[in-house]
Amino acid sequence: MTIKLIVGLANPGAEYAATRHNAGAWYVDLLAERLRAPLREEPKFFGYTSRVTLEGEDVRLLVPTTFMNLSGKAVGAMASFYRIMPDEILVAHDELDLPPGVAKFKLGGGHGGHNGLKDIINKLGNNPNFHRLRVGIGHPGDKNKVVGFVLGKPPVSEQKLIDDAIDEAARCTEVWFKEGLTKATNRLHAFKAQ
């Protein structure tokens, strides 16, 4: 099994760029920068895309330009055009249930109330069996404060932790392609930014 599409979830526009909900896109932006593959807007895929080669594998990068709750439109369009199966997709998203400084790989599962994941599952024919990179952003402690929290900007100290976890996740993505998912997962899951 190889990953052929890596997606970073976000809301579009400058006003959302630095918000916690865009943590998935920060990861794809970093990968694109590391692999010297600048993202370009591609309207037919409703997002910014790029093509990279990782260990000889052809991989597409995607940051949807739809709002978060319509992310499946972009993922579905690209998956269908390139005939990419759900288990060949890695979706990076912000995760309330992990603290800043932690990121984890996961295959399948529910959407946990994340509207981006919910729409992707829906547009992939109700198939939740794609890989996820869960980027920890922490939780406000009260479910009524979640919307304001994910659409807020983290303080500098938290931003550094999130950035460090994303940096490690990008390194572990390369490990995944070189040495397999188990090795990449073990390394990433042992990491906690200080």
UniProtKB/Swiss-Prot annotation:
- Its GO CC terms? cytoplasm
UniProt superkingdom: Bacteria
**Location within or outside the cell:** Cytoplasm
Which keywords does UniProt give here? Cytoplasm, Hydrolase, RNA-binding, tRNA-binding
* Catalytic activity as recorded in UniProt: an N-acyl-L-alpha-aminoacyl-tRNA + H2O = an N-acyl-L-amino acid + a tRNA + H(+)
Q: Which cysteines are joined by disulfide bonds?
A: none
Coiled-coil stretches are: none
Q: Where is this site: Discriminates between blocked and unblocked aminoacyl-tRNA?
A: 11
Q: What is its EC number?
A: 3.1.1.29
Name the GO terms of the biological process aspect: protein quality control for misfolded or incompletely synthesized proteins; rescue of stalled ribosome
Q: Which NCBIfam families does the record associate with it?
A: pth
Its subunit composition reads: Monomer.
Please report the name of this protein according to its UniProt entry. Answer: Peptidyl-tRNA hydrolase
Specify the species.
Citrobacter koseri (strain ATCC BAA-895 / CDC 4225-83 / SGSC4696)
Corresponding gene?
pth
